[in-house]
Amino acid sequence: MAKQDSVQLMTKGSIAKQIIGYAIPIFIGYLFQQLYNTVDALIVGNFLGQNALAAVTSVGSLIFLFVGFFNGFATGASVIIANAIGAQDEDRTKKAVYTTATFGIILGLIMTVSGYVLTDQMLMWMGSPQEVFGLSSTYLKIYFLGGFSLVLYNMLVGIIRAGGDAKHPLYYLIVSSILNVILDVVFITVFKMGVAGAAWATIISEFASMFLCAVQLAREESILHISWLHLTLDFENLKQICIYGLPTGLQGCVIDFANVMIQSYINSFGAAAIAGIGAYSKVEGFIFLPEISFSMALTTFVSQNEGAGQKERSRKGILFGLAASLLMIECMGVLIFLFAPTFISFFNQNLEVIEIGVARAKICAFFYILLGFSHVVSSVLRGLGRPVMPMVVMLVCWCAVRVVVLMIVGQSIHSLYLTHWLYPITWGLSSIVYVFDLRKYKLFTPRV
């Protein structure tokens, strides 16, 4: 079996070319991932009906609650590894790589066990409607059985991307996406497995992508090589991964906690509301792709260049990535605004479902630039070694404000429009805080 060296330094060469070259494979990869999530919802909604669609889409916030927390450690590990690579510290890099892989196995087992055991309790806490409770429970329990693969996959991708390689994860996502769609069709339309079929299709495809990442790292000839029979855990590196990863994980966790609360509120409006918001969330996922791609590119770019002491190059990269990301996400927002009814109708033909989804689109579409700004800046701060600031901002603006407003205003105003407006308002609050924080960083002043 051929060996390979996929490490690519981002400390020299064209800044724009490197950031775009790194971001494009991530964008395409997440596009495929979003497409298979969308196809999953399309198949469920059209073949299994409104309740099945509501069951699958309504648990998305719970899944993100778990995945967002554990992904924080993958981001933290990626920052540590990228910084060590930029500093050309081979010993520190190797220890961080092995610690990340070993820790990923541990975290994967934790997610699988805790998610499976807590499924029904979490659904009751969310106030899942009786007509979708059983379907949601079935889907979630099967999904969490594959949680190990998902967490380990994200940790391994963090290692690969820290070395500047975004292409191989793209290939694995494409394979996983195609496999997921094929299995969806077979399990749901041929074997009549219902929502269980959708869940099994997802976890099998996630295992495939995790396995491909593991094989790549075993074949590496670079400092990213992993010998899977000789895994070790370096506690100093584990400490650093937790220092960087825990704030990021908590950031994702608190955001998703707020989203779970909002989903609980939405659940009180019945299956049509759940399906309408759920369908739009699938459409909305495409809007996030540009800022996710550039955010991840900037985290690695900044980490490597800060590790190499190239602060001015880091600053220029931040400015370019921020401008490109905001331009793209707002273009996507305009597109969604214009064609929301068509996009929503792909998932369900029920007029009430379409109307609810379109209402969310019309309110949020022109505010996505604020969301993009907040996400990109938080990723930059993590790359700069400041993961606590984004956590605090998101905890206050995206969690506390949303939950408090929902608990106070939601008691007197029982309207879905409250949930529609909560998002752009809190995106604006976080953007204001980040503007003041960037002034201290002197983003528009050359650094030496």
What are the language-model segments listed below?
Residues 1-23, 81-148, 190-246, 302-367, ...:
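Short alpha-helical transmembrane segments in multi-pass integral membrane proteins
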Residues 53-113, 150-169, 276-340, 371-394:
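Small-residue-rich hydrophobic transmembrane alpha-helices
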Residues 31, 35-53, 123-130, 186-193, ...:
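Helix-terminus/linker motif at the lipid-water interface of multi-pass membrane proteins
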Residues 50-61, 140, 199, 271-286, ...:
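Small-residue hotspots at the loop-to-helix junctions and early N-terminal turns
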